[in-house]
């Protein structure tokens, strides 16, 4: 039963809509099938994500139902695409369907014209491609949200629409019902045919992550002399199986080929066309996908192997034809090597090794030529190919490094690019330590490590930017082995004077008592903070620098970074260890040390006298027993030493308690610690809230 009917005008001039779509998005009408199915897949992807939290909260949910079902009523010219995705409420239909143009359709098209062909349609915009073939389009949908009603939207290819909320029964999900414009002979011939729709689905949707069902599978019925439907759904989706030989093509054809193989991906950064007949016949196209800001992942099925256009495998694991690091690429390799489906045969073939060596050589030669001939293009694409280069360094450090060192690059925090030789020349004069080691400083996050980066720059040092997801941190270990007398240090792993130790001992130093009172006072406040472990050190950072900085050792960070690529790693389960370095040149820290000494002097004097006396006793005992082996000492002698050591330990604990009690309510210590933790991105939650309140109090 209809509860509410709304009519209105779509937020776009329909006369302007089709020319814009044709100009920017759809070179031919058949692309609408991809857009509609992609929207359905997108809706089910969201449903799966929602259900992963608590699928019992979703009515009649079953992951087995996550399928796109496509049907065609040839008699009436009605094409329906149904999904079991998240569906839409009336408000969502209003937002995503009726209000396509937020500030004008032209602006919307302009914003997305470069990405609109990436496979997953922009719901609303991709949906409107259906009007290229349909004279009327309906949406019947029900949201997964509790209490949602069925929504029915209708538009006849004009700015007017009708939107209804009903109590009609409808499963969660969406039906897109396209009434084909059969008055157009081209549309009638191209789209009102089950065979042609099936071909289009195979062309555009065969690699979708959910089943795409089009009718039923058929079998031959000899008694009827024809094929008849079975009860089994005809799922047109398959593994990444393609059967298209490479040929000399234009850039646009390369891109189109790539999108046919991998619908939904961004355009590739570059591609390499393999073409050889000696020493072995080899054809293929390898694409470098855009990988910046994405998690590292080896696509084992990214490269498909063919032999004379016959599919062999898309699982390259264990096959020496393609090194592991090449499996970051996408594409097709076609060779006439005598192949057998046996995995061991592939692994042991001498011809396979020759093919592999040729592929690596051609890829490296191509990258080197791009750097030489069009450096800007290479630099623009570097962030997309760096994972490939870095993984090559890690997995094949000897052979691959010798080729890749000619074109591999560093990027600094200012966004400038350098070859290895260029960068060494840049820093060689200024970034050597007292032992003549060249120190490469690097950061992994410019925003969170700004303080450390600027401190290094103030010293005239250059800082590289490494992307942890791009395997930079793992690759640098290989580079350290290859670069003569060189080391890489993360810019926030220590104070700059220790990162590049020039052997200069000049600077403000604290005496033993100052260091002790500060160390014990700060450690008493840091103990157990934020689930981290801390130690306190001292260094002259300059009187204009922060009073304190927090760092994590290079070794600790590397172990942690390495563990990201290892399952169940010990280092992933270990707590982080940080160093808090107090600036001895800071007037604030110096005054704080004086205040703490003054505040604790009276209570500490008798305790320190007691410690000195007990240390004297231990020294006398050790002197008395120095010539007696431990196993030859009497139980009485052992107990005498043990009691003396326990006594001095208890006295030291009393001393620590004095420091702890005195520092407990010291707002200056709290503020200094929190400023350091905040700059390191550690201060969060309740601790951050307390810091902000304390800061306001200081201002008052």
Predicted regions and their residues:
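GHKL/Bergerat-fold ATPase module in large chromosome/replication-associated machines
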Residues: 119, 137-160, 166, 181-700
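GHKL (Bergerat-fold) ATPase N-terminal catalytic module, capturing the glycine-rich phosphate-binding loop
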Residues: 1-191, 199, 599-601, 605-612, ...
């Amino acid at each position: 039963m209809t509860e509410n009917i709304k009519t209105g005008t779509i937020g776009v001039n329909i006369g302007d809509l089709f020319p814009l779509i044709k100009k920017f998005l759809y070179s031919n009408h058949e692309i609408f099938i991809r857009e509609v199915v992609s929207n359905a897949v997108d809706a089910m992807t969201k449903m799966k994500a929602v259900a992963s939290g608590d699928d019992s909260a979703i009515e009649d949910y079953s992951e087995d139902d996550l399928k796109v079902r496509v049907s065609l009523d040839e008699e009436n010219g009605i094409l329906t695409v149904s999904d079991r995705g998240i569906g839409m409420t009336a408000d969502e239909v209003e937002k995503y369907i009726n209000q396509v143009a937020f500030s004008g359709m032209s602006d919307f098209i302009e914003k997305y014209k470069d990405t609109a062909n990436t496979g997953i349609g922009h719901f609303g915009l991709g949906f409107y491609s259906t009007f290229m073939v349909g004279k009327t389009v309906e949406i019947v949908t029900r949201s997964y949200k509790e209490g949602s009603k069925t929504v029915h939207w209708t538009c006849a290819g004009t700015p007017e629409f009708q939107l209804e909320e009903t109590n009609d029964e409808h499963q969660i999900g969406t039906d897109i019902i396209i009434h084909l414009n059969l008055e157009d002979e081209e549309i009638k011939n191209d789209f009102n045919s089950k065979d042609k729709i099936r071909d289009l689905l195979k062309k555009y949707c065969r690699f979708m992550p959910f089943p795409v069902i089009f009718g039923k599978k058929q079998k031959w019925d000899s008694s009827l002399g024809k094929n008849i439907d079975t009860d089994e759904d005809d799922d047109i989706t398959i593994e990444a199986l393609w059967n298209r030989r490479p040929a000399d093509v234009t850039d646009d054809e390369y891109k189109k080929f790539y999108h046919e193989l991998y619908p939904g991906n961004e355009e590739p950064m570059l591609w390499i066309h393999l073409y050889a007949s000696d020493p072995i016949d080899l054809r293929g196209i390898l694409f470098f996908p855009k990988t910046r800001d994405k998690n590292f992942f080896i696509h084992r099925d990214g490269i498909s192997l063919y032999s004379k256009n016959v599919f062999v495998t898309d699982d390259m694991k264990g096959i020496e034809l393609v090194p592991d690091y090449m499996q970051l690429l996408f594409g097709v390799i076609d060779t006439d090597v005598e192949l057998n489906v046996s995995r061991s045969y592939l692994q042991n073939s001498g011809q396979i090794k020759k093919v592999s060596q040729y592929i690596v050589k051609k890829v490296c030669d191509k990258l080197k030529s791009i750097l030489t001939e069009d450096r800007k293009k290479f630099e623009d694409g570097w962030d997309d190919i760096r994972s490939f280069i870095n993984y090559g360094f890690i997995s094949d450090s000897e052979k691959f490094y010798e080729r890749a060192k000619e074109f591999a690059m560093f990027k600094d925090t200012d966004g400038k690019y350098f070859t290895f030789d260029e960068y060494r020349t840049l820093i060689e004069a200024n970034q050597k330590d007292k032992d003549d080691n060249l120190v490469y400083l690097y950061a992994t996050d410019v925003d969170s490590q700004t303080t450390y980066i600027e401190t290094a720059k103030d010293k005239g040092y250059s800082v590289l930017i490494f992307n942890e997801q791009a395997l930079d941190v793992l690759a640098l270990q290989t580079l350290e082995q290859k670069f003569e007398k060189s080391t890489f240090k993360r810019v926030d792993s220590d104070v700059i004077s220790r990162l590049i130790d020039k052997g200069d001992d000049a600077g403000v130093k604290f005496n033993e008592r100052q260091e002790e009172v500060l160390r014990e006072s700060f450690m008493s406040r840091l103990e157990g903070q934020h689930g981290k472990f801390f130690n306190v050190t001292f260094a002259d950072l300059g009187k204009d620098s922060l009073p304190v900085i927090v760092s994590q050792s290079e070794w600790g960070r590397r172990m942690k970074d390495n563990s990201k690529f290892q399952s169940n790693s010990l280092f992933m389960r270990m707590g982080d260890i940080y160093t808090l370095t107090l600036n001895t040149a800071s007037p604030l820290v110096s005054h704080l040390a004086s205040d703490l000494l003054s505040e604790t002097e009276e209570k500490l004097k008798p305790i320190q006298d007691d410690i000195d006396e007990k240390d004297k006793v231990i020294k006398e005992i050790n002197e008395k027993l120095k010539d007696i082996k431990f196993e030859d000492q009497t139980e009485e002698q052992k107990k005498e030493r043990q009691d003396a050591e326990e006594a001095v330990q208890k006295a030291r604990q009393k001393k620590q308690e004095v420091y702890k009690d005195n520092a407990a309510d010291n707002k200056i210590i709290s503020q200094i610690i929190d400023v350091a933790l905040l700059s390191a991105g550690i201060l969060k939650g309740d601790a951050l809230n307390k810091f902000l309140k304390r800061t306001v109090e200081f201002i008052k």
